[in-house]
A protein has these predicted regions:
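Long, charge-dense
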Residues: 87-114, 177-186, 264-280
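Active-site glycine-rich loop that binds ribose-phosphate moieties when present
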Residues: 99-108, 127, 133-149, 156-162, ...
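C-terminal functional extensions of proteins
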Residues: 227, 236-237, 244-250, 256-319
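Single conserved hydrophobic/aromatic residue that forms the stacking wall/gate
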Residues: 1-6, 10
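N-terminal glycine-rich anion-binding loops that anchor highly charged ligand groups
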Residues: 27-36, 40-42
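N-terminal basic/disordered segments at the start of proteins
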Residues: 11-28, 314-317
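Active-site cofactor/substrate anionic-group-binding motifs, chiefly glycine-
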Residues: 47-96
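Short hydrophobic/aromatic-enriched beta-strand-loop microsegments
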Residues: 45-53, 83-93, 134-139, 173-182, ...
Length: 319
C-alpha cells in the first residue's frame, strides 16, 4: 500500500491535473491573491495584490473567472466584468475589514459628514463601494488621496491604520476615519519585532500600511504586498523581517531564492494570527468543485453594480 505521504502526493497530483483539465474544458482562468495557500498560488493564471487583480480582471478574455481569494475581491471582478461568469470557491471567506463596515451603518456615518469625499479601501462590500466616490488599494491609497484637493474634506473607510498612515504622509487634517482594522495586521507585536531585529541586525523590516502606527514607524519600508515584493528585489539587504500576512512569503522565496524572509510574530504566538484565516479557506478541493459545478457564482444587483463600478474605475484611472 502507498504510504500516507505518497498517497497525499498522488491525491494532490490528481487534483492538480483535474483543475487544469476543468480550466480547459470550462474556458476558465484562475486569479489568486498573494495571501492564499502556496498550492493555490501555484494553479493561478495570474497572481497579484488587489489592485493588480482588479486591473487584470478587466483584461481577461476567458468567459469564466474563478477568483481564489476573499469575497470582496470576487465582487470587484464581477463589477468590472458584468458579462463574465465570476466564480467564488468559498463565498463564506470574508474579511474582517469588510465585515466591520456594514452598509446601513456606513450610510448613517456618511450622513454625519455631508460634503466629504468618500474614499473606500477595496476591502469592503460592493454595497459600500456603491456609496463611495473613489476606491483605493494599499498600493495607491496615497495617490488617490493626493488626487483630491487639499481643502476638500475626506471620509476614509474602513481601515483606520491605512487611513492614519496616509494622513501622516499627506499632512492632511481634514480626514475622518472609519474605525476598522484588519485582524491580521492589527496583531503584530512591536516588542517581538524589535527583539527579532536585534537577533538579525542586517535584516530590513518591511511592513504593510494596515499595521498599527507603532509598527510602520520602525519599518525600513512600508507598502502594499506588490510594493514590498519589488522592494525586497531592489534592496541590497539579504534578510527581511516581513510584517504582513505570511502567505506572501511563498512568492518572496520563489522570486528571491537567495534571500531570507522571516515572518514577524503576532502578539499571541498560539493563534497563527499572521495568517489570514479567510484566505486559507480557499483550497484546491474547493477550487475543483467550484469549476466542476460552475458554482457558487457572484451575483450583484445591477443598480448597485453600476454605482460601485464608478468608484472602482476612478481608482483604476488614478492608477
Amino acid at each position: 500500500a502507498l504510504s500516507s505521504a505518497a498517497s497525499d502526493v498522488y491525491k494532490r497530483q490528481n487534483l492538480l491535473s483535474r483543475i487544469e483539465e476543468l480550466k480547459r474544458r470550462k474556458g476558465a482562468v484562475i486569479l489568486a491573491h498573494y495571501y492564499t495557500l502556496p498550492e493555490v498560488q501555484a494553479v493561478a493564471d495570474f497572481l497579484g495584490d488587489s489592485l493588480a487583480l482588479s486591473i487584470e480582471a478587466q483584461k481577461v478574455e476567458a468567459r469564466t473567472i474563478l477568483f481564489a481569494g476573499v469575497h470582496f475581491m470576487a465582487e470587484t471582478a464581477k463589477v468590472l466584468c458584468p458579462d463574465k461568469k465570476v466564480l467564488i470557491p468559498v463565498p463564506e471567506a470574508s474579511c474582517s475589514l469588510a465585515d466591520g463596515c456594514e452598509a446601513e451603518a456606513f450610510r448613517r456615518f456618511r450622513a454625519r459628514y455631508p460634503g466629504h469625499t468618500v474614499v473606500s479601501y477595496v476591502n469592503t462590500s460592493v454595497e459600500i463601494k456603491a456609496q463611495t466616490d473613489v476606491c483605493c488599494t494599499s498600493s495607491n491609497a496615497l495617490k488617490v488621496v493626493e488626487s483630491i484637493p487639499a481643502e476638500q474634506p475626506i471620509l476614509f473607510a474602513p481601515d483606520r491604520n491605512l487611513g492614519a498612515y496616509v494622513q501622516k504622509l499627506t499632512g492632511r487634517t481634514n480626514m475622518v476615519l472609519w474605525d476598522g482594522a484588519c485582524h491580521v495586521h492589527e496583531e503584530f507585536s512591536l516588542e517581538k519585532l524589535l527583539a527579532l531585529r536585534e537577533e538579525h541586525p542586517g535584516a530590513e523590516v518591511v511592513a504593510h500600511p494596515e499595521c498599527r502606527a507603532y509598527i510602520t514607524a520602525v519599518a525600513d519600508f512600508v507598502g502594499s504586498t506588490a510594493a514590498i515584493l519589488d522592494y525586497c528585489g531592489r534592496s541590497d539587504a539579504q534578510e527581511f523581517i516581513v510584517v504582513t500576512e505570511a502567505g506572501i512569503l511563498a512568492e518572496m522565496q520563489r522570486r528571491y531564492p537567495r534571500k531570507r524572509f522571516i515572518p514577524a510574530p503576532p502578539d499571541d504566538d498560539t493563534c497563527g494570527c499572521n495568517n489570514c484565516f479567510y484566505m486559507k479557506m480557499v483550497t484546491l478541493e474547493r477550487i475543483a468543485a467550484c469549476l466542476e459545478n460552475e458554482s457558487p457564482e457572484v451575483v450583484i444587483d445591477e443598480q448597485v453594480r453600476r454605482a460601485a463600478e464608478r468608484s472602482i474605475r476612478r481608482m483604476i484611472e488614478i492608477g
